[in-house]
């Protein structure tokens, strides 16, 4: 369905509230004495990762590293994308070895993007642990992947979910429909 018939699940204030709650949950779970890296899956995951780092720093977290991960070459549907595949740069300026990694994305649906991100991450090294943060979780897994931290859940698998963020889209809302 097009976005014209979509319902707004979260407006800007709802996204802010979900991110605020996620930051609180993540802060409470951070291990002591282990370096932490927060990595967003390009494109909207990187925006959400930046927001999380800002919120965590505001709450007193220290030493957080932030990066972004391009998963294009790790996707299992790359052949289907053909020449339309757009490669973006992975920007992780820290060693992932032995680090507690918080992987961030906007929507978790089939699990295939997260699988690609995990493959890309382990090609960079061996993190101590990887935790998954998702703004919107929806049913429809094709792989056994679950989020550790979820902003909001959509119960129906027959609806499309569109996340718009000011930094990348000029608008701030989550639409379903």
Regions found by a protein language model. Name each.
Residues 1-177:
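PRPP-associated nucleotide enzymes
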């Amino acid at each position: 369905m097009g976005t014209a018939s979509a319902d707004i699940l979260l407006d800007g204030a709802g996204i802010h509230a979900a991110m605020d709650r996620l930051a609180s949950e993540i802060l409470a779970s951070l291990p002591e004495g282990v370096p932490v890296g927060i990595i967003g899956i390009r494109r909207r995951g990187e925006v959400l990762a930046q927001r999380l780092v800002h919120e965590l720093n505001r709450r007193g977290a220290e030493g957080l590293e932030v990066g972004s991960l391009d998963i294009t070459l790790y996707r299992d549907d790359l052949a289907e994308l053909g020449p339309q595949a757009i490669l973006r740069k992975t920007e992780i300026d820290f060693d992932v070895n032995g680090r507690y990694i918080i992987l961030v994305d906007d929507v978790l649906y089939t699990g295939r993007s997260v699988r690609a991100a995990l493959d890309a991450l382990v090609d960079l090294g061996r993190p101590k642990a990887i935790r998954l943060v998702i703004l919107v979780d929806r049913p429809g897994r094709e792989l056994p992947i679950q989020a550790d931290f979820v902003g909001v859940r959509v119960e129906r698998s027959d609806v499309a979910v569109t996340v718009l963020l000011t930094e990348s889209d000029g608008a701030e809302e989550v639409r379903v429909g």
